[in-house]
Amino acid sequence: MAKDIVILGIETSCDETAAGVVKNGKEVLSNVIYSQINVHKKYGGVVPEIASRKHIEAISFVVEEALNEAKLSLDEVDAIAATYGPGLVGPLLVGLSYGKALAYAKGKPFIGVNHIDGHIAANYIGGNLTPPFVCLVASGGHSHIVYVKDYGEYEVMGKTLDDAAGEAFDKVARALGLGYPGGPAIEKAAKLGNMEAIEFPKSFMEEGNFDFSFSGVKTAVLNYLNRQKQKGEEVNIYDVAASFQRNIVEVLVKKLVEAARFKNVSKVSIAGGVASNGFLRQKLEEDAKKFGLSVYYPEKIYCTDNGAMIAAAAYYDFVKGKFSGMDLNAIPYLKIGESDC
């Protein structure tokens, strides 16, 4: 019987200090997340310098807690992995440096993981999804449609050319006075509104174009709010939230389903913070069913940034013998499919 492979994964690319221990790429032994949301909320977004300092304060405790929950010592871990990009350079350096230091001190293999690869790998946790499939990765910093040929082998079919989906959620939520983070705030408000109330524009909707542009709909919402204010008319923020959410979700789902049909695959998945949106999941299930597509998505705890997804992604590098050197540096604008290991 093959030996179990246990990997410690560390994630600090933005404002979550996270560590998780995963066995064989699927079984989560622990997943500890220290969120900085309450710290950044008053600024309406993540402040990189503050995020870096908070990561430094929390990283050792979070890693120790992850090992304790897994009931393992560092000596019992087969490899250590950490995100090295994309993300904010200061936060990335905290987790990357800590992970490399642990690996060096214990003589363990080290694996640098692409953050987007981690989000895709979250779909493997506790489930039976196997490549090939098409995955939508949508979060505050990323919006990609990725054809997953095999574990760790990708073709980017489309990406955002300006604002990411989650970024648009944050900016519109701020304009509506709904607070930060915008995704959950918009989703909550949308449940009280009429999604057909306002028709906002959609970009790049022609067939075969899998790229995104969300700056247009964001600007359209801001212009609508300004016009209503100038006319002295009351704004129904719930209708605006619902109409905006419908716009974003319809674009995401249309392009994902179309990309899957283009690649002639029978499976689609979603990942990233936006993947926890209930309306997105509902709409995808409905549209995918029309074309006989199976839908997969991670548990919501694995949609946000977490260490378990980094450990899961690293497992597939481990079995291929693909390790990183101690000279691996943070790459803030790392693209999926690129490797600097």
Curated annotation (Swiss-Prot):
GO terms for molecular function: iron ion binding; N(6)-L-threonylcarbamoyladenine synthase activity. The keyword Signal does not apply. InterPro entries: ATPase_NBD (IPR043129), Gcp-like_dom (IPR000905), KAE1/TsaD (IPR017861), TsaD (IPR022450). GO terms for cellular component: cytoplasm. Its EC number is 2.3.1.234. Its main location: cytoplasm. Fe cation binds at H115, H119, D305. Pfam families: TsaD. Substrate binds at V137, A138, S139, G140, G141, D170, G183, N277. GO terms for biological process: tRNA threonylcarbamoyladenosine modification. The keyword NAD does not apply. Binds 1 Fe(2+) ion per subunit. It is an enzyme of class 2 (transferase). Keywords: Acyltransferase, Cytoplasm, Iron, Metal-binding, Transferase, tRNA processing. It is found in: Cytoplasm. It catalyses: L-threonylcarbamoyladenylate + adenosine(37) in tRNA = N(6)-L-threonylcarbamoyladenosine(37) in tRNA + AMP + H(+). Signal peptide: none annotated. Its cofactor is Fe(2+). Required for the formation of a threonylcarbamoyl group on adenosine at position 37 (t(6)A37) in tRNAs that read codons beginning with adenine. Is involved in the transfer of the threonylcarbamoyl moiety of threonylcarbamoyl-AMP (TC-AMP) to the N6 group of A37, together with TsaE and TsaB. TsaD likely plays a direct catalytic role in this reaction. PANTHER family: TRNA N6-ADENOSINE THREONYLCARBAMOYLTRANSFERASE, TRNA N6-ADENOSINE THREONYLCARBAMOYLTRANSFERASE, MITOCHONDRIAL. Belongs to the KAE1 / TsaD family. This is tRNA N6-adenosine threonylcarbamoyltransferase. It comes from Caldanaerobacter subterraneus subsp. tengcongensis (strain DSM 15242 / JCM 11007 / NBRC 100824 / MB4).
